[in-house]
Swiss-Prot record:
Cleaves both 3' and 5' ssDNA extremities of branched DNA structures. One of its GO terms (molecular function) is single-stranded DNA endodeoxyribonuclease activity. It is found in: Cytoplasm. GO terms for cellular component: cytoplasm. It is an enzyme of class 3 (hydrolase). Keywords: Cytoplasm, DNA-binding, Endonuclease, Hydrolase, Nuclease. This is Endonuclease NucS. It comes from the Bacteria. Belongs to the NucS endonuclease family. Its EC number is 3.1.-.-.
Amino acid sequence: MRIIVADCSAEYSERLNASLPLAKRVLLIKADNSLLIFSELGSYKPLNWMSAPCSIRDITPDHADDDVDTEVPQKVIRASADKSNDVLEVTLQRIYSDESYDLGEDPGLIKDGVEDHLQKYLAEQIERIGKGAKLVRREYPTAIGPVDIMAIDGNGEHVAIEIKRNGGIDGVEQLTRYCDLLNRDPLLAPVHGIFAAQTITPQARVLAQDRGFKCLLLDYEEMKGTEDDSLRLF
């Protein structure tokens, strides 16, 4: 993991055009080359990012210095998507810190009991999302974290399912990021989204439906009661 603190600006081009003016920010570059830009604003969501698979180039301009009042930056980091022409270019005007760390292998997120069981039961009862649905796998890996469940619907199209105990706007945002990323892969697209939870706030439901996601209410006790009891004695 490479962590950079710098006065920087950024430009994202091709699929969409977006820019960040000069300000002090934190850049994370992960081992898979994904690049994320953070600031004090917002919550956990980066201001902008380039997801893997992508390539990273460090460019040191001629006559580079750390004077924010000059036009010559210390460094430019260019992240280029492997499967599209998307480019995220970050201009580092002044670098305060640039450190790399070997974090080793992560054991992954350990979910609380109810949420983990909801995922288990829905995976076993995947036709709850629709007739003819089939499970691909639980904890489907992506560059930005695992999708709770990846499935294929009755039409043969992929479905990413985000599961929460109590579904709020943050969960919809998380599902949005997964679907945005997965739909860039021509082998998976189109990827639809389902937001599944025991309870879903009205605001989260409106946002999910606005983004084209289906909402699915999960009855924990009822799903638990349909477990395979063929080996139970009583």
